[in-house]
């Protein structure tokens, strides 16, 4: 399913769901994913690099979708969360990126119910998106933490900020007898 078709379906679904009151709608775009991304009939041929054309197309598509949302009656009472799942894995695309440049994902909260002065340079993981998303929707989170995540609109350190990436990577690689037996069913 090409992302432009996904956005068309999403518009139809959101229009229908908006008649039913408060809803959660989630979608995941895939045109920028490996192995080479997916060009659609709307992608420009502006750049020499295929991936650059796909990224430009994706950027225009997401912008167009958000602009459409802004024209809807439900927009003012809606929180939009845009979250990247990971930096590009297309190594050939990042070969010229300086090694000291920290590549991150794009994350954006539109119509957030909370604000902060600390909007850049936080170290965080996807685990922090759980409490942060609820906070931007207006939920009060006692202690600003849920599971292993920290509300990024709080001044509390995330587990990455507190312990460092290497330590967290080591910890999540460890096995758990409980998880192996009861969740993964390895035993």
Language-model-derived ranges and their functions:
Residues 1-187:
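Solvent-exposed soluble domains appended to multi-pass membrane proteins
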């Amino acid at each position: 399913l090409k992302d432009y078709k996904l956005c068309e379906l999403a518009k139809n679904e959101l229009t229908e769901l908006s008649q039913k009151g408060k809803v959660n709608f989630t979608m995941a775009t895939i045109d920028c994913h490996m192995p080479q991304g997916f060009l659609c009939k709307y992608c420009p041929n502006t750049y020499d690099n295929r991936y650059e054309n796909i990224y430009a197309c994706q950027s225009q598509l997401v912008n167009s979708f958000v602009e459409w949302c802004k024209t809807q009656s439900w927009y003012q009472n809606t929180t939009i969360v845009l979250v990247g799942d990971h930096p590009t894995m297309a190594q050939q695309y990042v070969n010229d990126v300086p090694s000291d440049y920290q590549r991150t994902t794009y994350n954006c909260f539109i119509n957030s119910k909370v604000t902060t002065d600390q909007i850049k340079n936080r170290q965080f993981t996807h685990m922090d998106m759980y409490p942060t998303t609820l906070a931007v929707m207006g939920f009060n989170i006692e202690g600003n933490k849920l599971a292993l995540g920290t509300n990024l609109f709080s001044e509390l350190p995330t587990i990455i900020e507190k312990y460092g990436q290497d330590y967290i990577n080591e910890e999540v690689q460890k096995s758990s007898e409980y998880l192996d037996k009861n969740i993964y069913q390895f035993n």
